[in-house]
Amino acid sequence: MKPRLCFITNIGPHYRLPIFQKISETFSCDFYLGDHINTKIKTFDYNKLKGYKETLHNRFFHNFYWQNGSLQLVNKDYTHYILDGEPYCLSSWIILLWALIKHKETIAWTHGFYGNESFTKNIIKKVYYKLFTKLMVYSEYSISVMKSKGFNPKKMYCIANSLDSAHLLDIRKRLCKSDLYSKHFNNNYPVVIYCGRIQKRKQLNQIIDSAKMLYEENCPINVIFVGKDVDRVDIPCYAKAKGIEQNVWMYGPCYEDSTLAELFYNASVCVSPGNIGLTAIHALSFGCPIITHNNFAEQMPEFESIKPSKTGYFYQQGDIADLKDKIRKVISADEKTREEIREEAFKEIDKKWNIDYQINVLKKVLENE
């Protein structure tokens, strides 16, 4: 019997519309999407999704929430249910138990374990994930953590993550070098780019500290920050105190992929001292290597796209001298090596961090009953 999928998720983030559309085109799948979560996030227009059926109202109780109208979906003629894999969603616990009784398949699309869970959270997660038939986990790292906790590896699949793969590939084919940085900075120094919200937890001052150290070593760089300051971090003030304000460009937020492509392609390296998330996919899609910290328990799954010496580097978390050394290693590459790095970046995206890869994983999950 051909699988009939029911996809229940807490919200429809803007970046997931392309993968949801592809799922809708490839499988018989209906989508039930939550109306809001407690953190501000940009959503897509649900009516644009071919398989969209209904918006579910999320009722929050502190960190926990209940999706009104989700339980009745178990009584419909779906064969498989794809859930977020969030233990905080109380209604999903009931759906899992009910589906178990009705002999229906359940699939988690989840971060799984980070490896730094408290004793209580560890127990709750173990019980919760054991209720699923299959687990689609964002990273191999999380799968390895779950294996160590007794989860059956045959029931786990690495789903990775993606952006609008076809769109980004089309932009990539038109990429070329430009002089936007030399025009802005009035020099030809290597450029470090950070792209994302400017928050205190991102520890962006470490980039300024590294730039100052490199300046003192007679290896000056420019730094561009692409994103909105949502935490009053005030990087310009910090850069001025370090005496390198003329080498810092506060670009502001940018959501246009073709503009981001030019910024990434012409930069030397993307640095994220905090965790690295979807920015990694954006950077590598446009040929820019990445540097981030090496504490994987505090990382987002996209850190796995970094292959040391090929698509970027990891530095010792909190060690600014090591971050500086890693930046220096990348910016010291000659043009031939820089071009090889671009090709490695493209190769990594084409291999795993794209929609086609995710669709193939979902096919395997549905085939291996």
Where would I find each of the regions flagged by the language model?
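Acidic donor-binding loop of glycosyltransferase active sites
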Residues: 262-275, 288-289
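A short, histidine- and acid-enriched strand-loop-helix "catalytic/donor-clamping" loop
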Residues: 104-123, 131-134
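Conserved donor-binding/catalytic core segment of Leloir-type glycosyltransferases
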Residues: 6, 181-202, 208-211
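A charged, aromatic-enriched C-terminal amphipathic alpha-helix characteristic of glycosyltransferases
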Residues: 332-366
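Short hydrophobic beta-strand element within catalytic cores of glycosyltransferases
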Residues: 289-298
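Nucleotide-activated donor-binding/catalytic signature segment of Leloir-type glycosyltransferases, i.e.
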Residues: 2, 226, 233-254
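Donor nucleotide-sugar binding/catalytic pocket of nucleotide-sugar-dependent glycosyltransferases
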Residues: 132-179, 187, 194
